[in-house]
């Protein structure tokens, strides 16, 4: 699927590179790194396996495969695209931390604060929810994926009630780490769009994603969903820059 598509694209872009597909569960580890079938070792990997799950992976003999993999990376036995540091951004409470620091007016520069104010919905830790004003808030699991367990709640004083919930058809197929905490964001009403998909014309909502390389924007992606809370039902939308 996605992994093989990326492999083929890399082969096209870098035909001189020896690019191979290897399932994480077929991977072997030795003191030198990750051995391949011809006796060589992998020097650069593109990781798609979710980091929050990888760290707990074990072999059939109950050896800590994930920990051994990360130890080898720390020893510079191989390099990684999408490295372990990415786990910081995968935890949704990171947005709560950024917004909390923004509110102090002591941590970010003026340009940083302008970017946060424009692009980050006000975000809060679970422990701060009781002190927020009454209104609508989005509740998200900190390790949630594909809209799983996303709810919109109506806060009334010290209590809250369900206003909207994301119902996921393929709940059991969504692989993610169990979350013991949630975070909250202000509910911001989205604009509605009409889009033609494979089954006809639908009314729904757009989600834009910006991919960064360092501090530079490298690409923009767009998804369309008939639902306000997008999940696996969303369609990828082609973008045209005029």
Q: What role is predicted for each listed range?
A:
Residues 1-242:
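Domain-scale recognition of functional cores that engage charged ligands
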């Amino acid at each position: 699927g996605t992994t093989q598509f990326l492999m083929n694209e890399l082969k096209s872009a870098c035909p001189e590179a020896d690019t191979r597909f290897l399932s994480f569960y077929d991977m072997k580890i030795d003191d030198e790194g990750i051995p391949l079938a011809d006796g060589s070792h992998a020097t650069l990997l593109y990781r798609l396996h979710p980091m929050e799950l990888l760290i707990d992976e074990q072999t059939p003999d109950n050896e800590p495969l994930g920990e051994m993999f990360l130890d080898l990376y720390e020893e510079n036995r191989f390099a990684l695209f999408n490295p372990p540091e990415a786990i910081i951004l995968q935890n949704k409470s990171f947005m709560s931390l950024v917004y909390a620091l923004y509110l102090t007016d002591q941590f970010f520069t003026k340009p940083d604060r302008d970017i946060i104010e424009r692009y980050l919905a006000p975000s809060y830790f679970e422990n701060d929810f009781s002190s927020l004003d009454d209104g609508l808030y989005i509740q998200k699991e900190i390790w949630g994926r594909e809209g799983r367990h996303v709810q919109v709640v109506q806060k009334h004083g010290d209590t809250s009630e369900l206003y909207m919930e994301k119902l996921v058809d393929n709940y059991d197929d969504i692989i993610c780490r169990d979350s013991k905490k949630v975070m909250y964001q202000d509910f911001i009403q989205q604009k509605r769009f009409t889009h033609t998909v494979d089954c006809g014309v639908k009314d729904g909502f757009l989600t834009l994603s910006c991919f960064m390389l360092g501090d530079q924007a490298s690409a923009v992606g767009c998804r369309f969903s008939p639902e306000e809370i997008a999940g696996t039902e969303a369609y990828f939308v082609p973008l045209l820059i005029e």
